[in-house]
């Protein structure tokens, strides 16, 4: 089947995370000349497809996920019955990221690769916990001395049109929980209470929106973003016993969890508080002079006639795991204007260009 037909079939699988619903088997059958390793961890199904072309040379990998977020209500048609209309294919996962998977499957089928090994790393655990998927496959590969030299993760990276953006890194993510303790009492007798809202009010303006670093050419500043704040009993005559606050920092490599901890401790000095911090993902950056960045840039410009912005914007992805294992990685895919949305769709023209970009990359790597 051709690339579009393959994408349409792939979109029919109700692979709501972490269930692959048979999508991984379907892909393995399409690439029957590749060695297939089904790697399961904690009930999560992953697939490594790999093919050796020669003994010496470079190992290039493509990474992606077949799991999708739930469809939800309000769709114009069944989210798992792909609908083609006016140059678009509508279905859950059309942009995020079955189009990317279908594109690199088509590319490896049709490209003439001159390197040593091609691999496809696929998971059904990216939209959820994302800890037993790509990470587990890379761990398995490391144990067998099979790690790739370079990787492309086919997440939807483009903003307005195919070719306008390549991700060369990602910010990390640090989650924080702050508990300010007080003493509950009657609002008519504030002198007998310890009101954590009053105590914390001057500190809030030092926390909310604060830039922990100035940013760089590649990364925006590591900003503290308040995501939740609550206290009290929902009544007007009782002061709260404590105040609970949650925040997130999308951090660059210039700001660590320890930096966040140090700043919060400094501004909360004198308060009775508890602080909990967790790094859910780490920042990474692939140098713009690296081969994978240069070759991807060349292929994108050649096929799309766009000059892509090389950036680190957006949330986290499985590319961070490749970077952690020392693999030089970039991300490139279709536009992301409808990801996780009702009536998610992908442009057929964009998808076909993506297939050609990946094919060109493989052949000229």
Swiss-Prot record:
Its UniProt pathway annotation is: Amino-acid biosynthesis; L-lysine biosynthesis via DAP pathway; LL-2,6-diaminopimelate from (S)-tetrahydrodipicolinate (succinylase route): step 3/3
Report which superkingdom the organism of origin falls in: Bacteria
A Pfam family (short name) is Peptidase_M20
- Which keywords fit this entry according to its UniProt record? Amino-acid biosynthesis, Cobalt, Diaminopimelate biosynthesis, Hydrolase, Lysine biosynthesis, Metal-binding, Zinc
> Could you cite one Gene Ontology molecular function of this protein?
metal ion binding
According to its UniProt record, which reaction does this protein catalyse?
N-succinyl-(2S,6S)-2,6-diaminopimelate + H2O = (2S,6S)-2,6-diaminopimelate + succinate
Name the active site residues: 67, 126 (proton acceptor)
List the Gene3D superfamilies hit by this protein, alphabetically. Answer: 1.10.150.900, 3.30.70.360, Zn peptidases
How are cofactors bound according to the entry's free-text note? Binds 2 Zn(2+) or Co(2+) ions per subunit.
SUPFAM superfamilies in the record:
Bacterial exopeptidase dimerisation domain, Zn-dependent exopeptidases
Provide the residue positions that the database annotates as binding Zn(2+) 2.
Answer: 96, 127, 340
GO annotations under biological process? diaminopimelate biosynthetic process; L-arginine biosynthetic process; lysine biosynthetic process via diaminopimelate
Q: Which cofactor does it need?
A: Zn(2+); Co(2+)
Q: Which InterPro entries match?
A: ArgE/DapE_CS, Bact_exopeptidase_dim_dom, DapE_proteobac, Peptidase_M20, Peptidase_M20_dimer, Peptidase_M20A
* Amino-acid positions noted as binding Zn(2+) 1 in the UniProt annotation, renumbered to this chain: 65, 96, 155
Q: EC?
A: 3.5.1.18
Query: Family, per the entry?
Result: Belongs to the peptidase M20A family. DapE subfamily.
Q: How does it assemble?
A: Homodimer.
Job description of the protein: Catalyzes the hydrolysis of N-succinyl-L,L-diaminopimelic acid (SDAP), forming succinate and LL-2,6-diaminopimelate (DAP), an intermediate involved in the bacterial biosynthesis of lysine and meso-diaminopimelic acid, an essential component of bacterial cell walls.
Q: What is this protein called?
A: Succinyl-diaminopimelate desuccinylase
**Gene transcribed to yield this protein:** dapE
